[in-house]
């Protein structure tokens, strides 16, 4: 499963599952408006590149394309 992540700060991330780039950009812009500080610290990466992240209170089987997920970093 591919998740595109947007980093809000060092602990909270929003992930969007398996989206075409144009739709992802649209949702990304909405998150930018909600979190102005994102503009300067935007960090996009995939699940495989950041294995320290996991889903917060979500069952992977229930995630649909386009869902926006709140993420957090696991303690090492």
Walk through the language-model features, giving the residues of each.
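Ubiquitin system architectures
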Residues: 1-76
């Amino acid at each position: 499963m591919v998740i595109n992540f947007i980093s809000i700060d060092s602990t909270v991330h929003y992930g969007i599952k398996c989206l075409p780039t144009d739709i992802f950009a649209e949702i990304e812009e909405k998150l930018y408006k909600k979190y102005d500080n994102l503009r300067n610290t935007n960090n996009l990466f995939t699940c495989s590149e950041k294995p320290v992240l996991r889903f917060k209170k979500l069952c992977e089987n229930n995630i649909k394309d386009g869902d926006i997920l709140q993420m957090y970093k696991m303690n090492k």
